[in-house]
């Protein structure tokens, strides 16, 4: 009877270090659960991804996708066409007076580098802006200072009351305390959180995420004039002052 004999080579223990080195060199970057380069921790000042920067610094107030937040939507092509890149950058870097928008630049104690602020501005305008759609739109002056430089007079509260009844009362109520489509625009708590410029911006571009029309659409075929915008903003702001005086007198 014939027997088959298998010859098994003796394992050389000296090969173990070589095998371990080979496995670590070849398979280390493919281990299950290992984070990708994008997922790895990095210092906050080295984050250069727009989505991460926006989520960490802006989404809490302006909404996860730039809309439906407590503050003005930034995902609004009309707003981004009205506001220059330099103005937007200044607001991010220096904050906005009389609002809860903080200064984010490192030079004033914020967390963001100049490069990160530039990335936020560029990201908003490239992702959410449609400047070419507004090439033929004659925008009102963005600020009261711009309005003065272009020939408009200062706002007048008495004229503003008439402007309010014409363009705004149908949504916000005859006295400004709220109506069928919009909330109060003279509530002291609201006015304490917004600047005059924020009021002006809201009048000009509306709130696209909440259905508030811009300066062209309150009355079909009749846009608000730059003077009317300044007047109604002055009327709105006068309620902030009146509320402050009433509070101090108590």
Annotate the PLM regions.
Residues 57, 71-73, 77-119:
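Long, charged N-terminal interaction/targeting segments
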Residues 32-40, 44, 48, 52-55, ...:
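Flexible coil segments in periplasmic/lumen-exposed cytochrome c-class electron-transfer proteins
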Residues 25-27:
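C-terminal motif of bacterial Sec signal peptides marking the signal peptidase cleavage site
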Residues 55-58, 71, 98, 165, ...:
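Disulfide-stabilized extracellular ectodomain repeats and their linkers
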Residues 1-11:
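N-terminal secretory signal peptides that target proteins for export/translocation
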Residues 12-19:
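Sec-dependent signal peptide recognition
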Residues 40-47, 51, 63, 67-93, ...:
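Gly/Gly-Pro-rich "capping" loops immediately C-terminal to redox-active cysteine motifs
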Residues 29, 59-62, 172:
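Sequence contexts marking disulfide-bonded cysteines in secreted/extracellular proteins
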């Amino acid at each position: 009877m014939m027997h088959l004999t298998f010859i098994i080579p003796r394992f050389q223990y000296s090969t173990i270090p070589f095998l371990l080195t080979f496995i670590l060199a070849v398979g280390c970057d493919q281990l299950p659960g290992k984070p990708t380069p994008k997922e790895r921790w990095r210092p906050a000042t080295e984050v250069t991804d727009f989505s991460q920067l926006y989520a960490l610094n802006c989404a809490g107030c302006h909404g996860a996708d730039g809309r439906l937040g407590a503050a003005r939507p930034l995902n609004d092509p009309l707003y981004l066409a009205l506001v220059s890149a330099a103005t937007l950058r200044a607001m991010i870097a220096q904050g906005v007076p009389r609002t809860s928008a903080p200064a984010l630049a490192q030079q004033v104690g914020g967390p963001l580098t100049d490069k990160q602020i530039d990335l936020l501005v560029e990201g908003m305008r490239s992702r959410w802006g449609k400047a070419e759609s507004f090439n033929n739109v004659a925008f009102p002056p963005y600020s009261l200072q711009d309005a003065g430089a272009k020939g408009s007079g200062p706002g007048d509260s008495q004229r503003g009351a008439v402007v309010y009844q014409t363009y705004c009362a149908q949504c916000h109520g005859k006295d400004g305390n709220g109506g069928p489509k919009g909330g109060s625009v003279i509530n002291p708590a609201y006015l304490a959180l917004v600047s005059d410029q924020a009021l002006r911006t809201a009048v000009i571009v509306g709130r696209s995420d909440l259905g508030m029309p811009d300066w062209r659409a309150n009355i079909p075929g009749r846009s608000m004039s730059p003077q009317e915008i300044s007047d109604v903003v002055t009327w709105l702001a006068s309620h902030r002052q009146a509320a402050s005086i009433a509070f101090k007198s108590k």
